Amino acid sequence: MAVYPPLRKVRMSVRTPAKEVGADVRLTELFDTQTADFSPLLAKVKSSGAQYLIVVLSHASSDVFAKQWHDAQVPVPYGGIDVKSMDGDFYSRIGGKAISEVAANFAVRAPLTKKTIPFFDEFKKNSANYPVYTAFFAYDSVYIYAEAVKRAGSFDTDKVIKELEKTKFEGVGGEIVFDEMHDVQTGKGKMNLIFAQWQDKGERAVLYPKELRTGTFILPPWMKK
């Protein structure tokens, strides 16, 4: 396994638990967010013998990284936290060179709930853009707040908070229930971080959680036997 997080603390948060579960971490690297040539890093990955590359890309250019990984036909599939790869047009934007990348996301056109696909399609129809994860949360939050106010029969802050704490709402991405710290609960049927893979024709297949899986993992085309 090779790991390329841009932040030192993130590097340790990935490397330590990976080792704890028995993963063989071959190397970890940091790089400047302005990096335009990833070939030296990709060469290290290739020579490391790693079977999978985990990335954490936020401020760096995901487009450039994916293109160079693809063009070099690096024999190591990759995925992780890649903010720009969460964009619905990422695959088409870089000419399909994101094929097989697995990226964490919340907003994927998949039957996460009965609301997901209708919302996704209506959003695209009305805005000409694909929704990102913030769109899911913003949409749901309006309805959650409105229902809490209705139950409270008031806009009084304390009364509304008490009703918000009772929330059990089927959202676009999963059921929304708050815990005692007012965080959204995760778990089967609830809101979850989804890992989805870019596949042929720009389709995204959900690989995790298992109960939401819509496809199977594929290798980059040049690694297929």
Located regions from the model:
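Extracellular/periplasmic periplasmic-binding protein-like sensory domains
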Residues: 69-139, 150-153, 209-225
